[in-house]
Amino acid sequence: MDLMYVSTRNANEKVTASQAILKGLADQGGLFVPTKIPALELDWDQLKEMSYQETAYEVMKLFLTDFTEEELKNCIKNAYDEKFDTEEIAPLRKADGAYFLELFHGSTIAFKDMALSILPHLMITSARKNQIKNEIVILTATSGDTGKAALAGFAGVEGTKIVVFYPKNGVSPIQEKQMITQKGDNTCVIGIHGNFDQAQTGVKTMFSDKVLAEEMNAAGYQFSSANSINIGRLVPQIVYYVYAYAKLLKQGAIKKGEEINIDVPTGNFGNILAAFYAKNMGLPVGKLICASNDNKVLYDFFETGVYDKNRDFILTTSPSMDILISSNLERLIYRICGNDAEKNVKLMQELKEEGKYEITAEMKEALSGFYGNYCTEEETAATIKRIYEQDGYVIDTHTAVAAGVYDKYRKETGDDKVTVIASTASPFKFTRAVMTAIDPKYADMEDFALVDELSALAKVKVPNAIEEIRTAPVKHDIQCEVDGMQAEVKKFLGI
């Protein structure tokens, strides 16, 4: 019997995994969630001997039950190959009393590669399974990392086109250069004069525009999403938490069944939600530590039970977390209100109309497995400097937010469980912020000179993703206002 996916906003909308991957977003703006969380089938003695690819199969087959073994193994083989610069795919590095799970060894040096290298293969396979003849148009909003990882994943993939919107002044110079130099005739990159939340709202609006959908269909196109709202992004992310636990076991850092904490720098809530799903599958997890930057809407939510986006949007040195509407949180809300779509819709309606909602005491009780805290800009910079001076290990700004929050958590609770920190981007992606945190003397250096300095300092070679863009020509220079997004998509598609 296939595991089905249901919309968080409509109990009657049930689809298979492949249909959920193709649709991306459910009708009425809902998100697809599995009707139940499957339990891990293998024991840890087996899992600890497995490669990343083998672990991926064992986890993903439980969620993508309408894929054949051959289909799923092919997707995995095509995703986790030499695009990653280490055979381990996601190595663990011990520093500062924790284990950093390095999720940045893929082609765009950010954790998004872990899911976005497999999503195109899942999507093309899903299209074949469902006899889809239309060309699939991936529509994505990015706060910096998703965009490039999605572009790299879909560039040149037959039967697809991809359009990425990013906030023109809301990403790092290296993030922007990575996107606007992207090769591939099926790619389009557009800078909007607005912030990430506006880009994400614009994309969601296009998804739910019935008239646009009809025009697209008539021209032989249909939309899907590469954002973390797509279940095809979420499922591959569960894998690396299972893999990390198995590796800790193999190294003798933990005993079988021993609980670990997982600490995740959080913006759109997808990465920590994957850890929550892993815990519900039977992964022994104590606390899920949700780390925010100055845009601390999630910290306030865990503290008070009130989600309130009515606040200033702050641009920080950890831009992938500069988010006030945390999309994937809806999947957790749906779960803690007893999988009740009506209750969830009411809360989401309040968010849309008033910019806030409050959960019940009973729902808040269901969040006791989470701990939320945040780091200011100063604390983030101080954490980068401290860990470099203490361990010779250089982390990026997002990872530093998580490491800083972990430091607060330990001091507050005295909890000394083994902790895995999701290291979500290479420091080379945020070179200026990282280097000036270590020493202000770097403030006036040119971007690529800083890259070489960081390489010498960290004793790590410059990643290919950075070398490639040093001299790459700009291929995309389109900009638009927030209300001009749909017109740009139509122009690219020739509708």
What are these regions (language model features)?
Residues M1-I495:
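PLP-dependent amino-acid enzyme catalytic core
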